[in-house]
């Protein structure tokens, strides 16, 4: 019977982050109120994020890349390299989440529930990526 590898949970965390990008990450009540999601969609009167490719779009691209790397690690396709890449990408996503907060959250802009969902997903992705990396490297050591 096959066992469930930790890398599949990294895939789940990346999917949660990907979906959370469309949830409200920023909210405001100033000027009539408004919300913005991580990918730049705005509703109401909110000035941030500015138009163009930004941190939120980069997070979506990297979370898609994390899905691929973690799935490769879970399936055993270059598991050591893929699990190391998954850890690197998940740490980078955590840094980008912090950077998003530093760039856009200041009074009267507050974080929305999507930011919390995405932040928790990235934190879990880092922890689970470490477990996936340990599992991949220890499994490769047993085969030799």
Model regions: which residues?
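Compact integral membrane and secretory-pathway proteins
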Residues: 1-144
């Amino acid at each position: 019977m096959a066992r469930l590898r930790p890398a599949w949970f990294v895939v789940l965390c990346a999917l949660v982050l990907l979906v959370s990008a469309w949830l409200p990450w920023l909210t405001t009540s100033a000027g009539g109120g408004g919300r913005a999601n991580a990918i730049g969609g705005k509703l109401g009167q909110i000035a941030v994020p500015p138009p163009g490719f930004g941190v939120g779009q980069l997070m979506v691209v990297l979370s898609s890349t994390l899905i691929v790397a973690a799935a490769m690690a879970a399936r055993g396709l270059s598991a050591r390299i893929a699990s190391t890449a998954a850890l690197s990408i998940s740490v980078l996503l955590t840094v980008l989440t912090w950077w998003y907060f530093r760039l856009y959250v200041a009074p009267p802009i507050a974080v929305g529930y999507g930011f919390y969902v995405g932040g928790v997903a990235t934190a879990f992705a880092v922890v689970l990526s470490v477990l996936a990396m340990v599992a991949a490297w220890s499994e490769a050591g047993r085969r030799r």
